[in-house]
């Protein structure tokens, strides 16, 4: 069974996240096309301090199970500032598959909960609805899988974080982005340049993702109308041509000379 993506990668970073000034940022993007297909993109980036304090981190990251589950993996690769980044993508053929994939990103403690994307209406006039909530439960426990918690009796390094007086929000950042087709009817996120974004609170505060957009495909509507119009004109042209031919033949028959006896 595939371990949750954020849990999977974050487990490799957990040992060094607790060190002062280290940081890991995750961006999850749901991109939906007008026809309902699209892509989910997950980008996880560790800063330079993590790489310096854990030089073997790059080799420790394992993604074989993610690849087996259909995710495309790029990296981990070096960033310009000396950090590491890994990118995971997965295409989907419709909202139902997208909902399933969103469920693979994090565990039951967060940060993504009850994520659902639906589509209603017609191809040329459809409404997309995004539901769910962002919430991190239990601090670092949100980034450890059940097997690890059962083995250790709790999230690893919690005592170190508490002893160091570190704020989880200073060490971990998660942003969820939604790129949905059409005009935004309502959303709880920040919308800019066609992207709706939410920042995941690290203090356990729940954030609703309630969003609705309506997509009216004007080009397709015009195309369909034009097709009907052209067919109608063609039909009229055929009828007019038949009538004209009939009138010409009738006129010729009237002008035909009477044979002499």
Residue ranges and their predicted role:
Residues 219-261:
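C-terminal single-pass membrane-anchor helix
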Residues 123-229:
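Intrinsically disordered, low-complexity linkers and stems that provide flexible hinges
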Residues 18-21:
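C-terminal motif of bacterial Sec signal peptides marking the signal peptidase cleavage site
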Residues 48-132:
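Structured domain cores in non-transmembrane regions
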Residues 31-48:
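Post-signal peptide N-terminal segment of mature Sec-exported envelope proteins
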Residues 23-25:
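Bacterial signal peptide processing site
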Residues 1-10:
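Bacterial N-terminal signal peptides that target proteins for export
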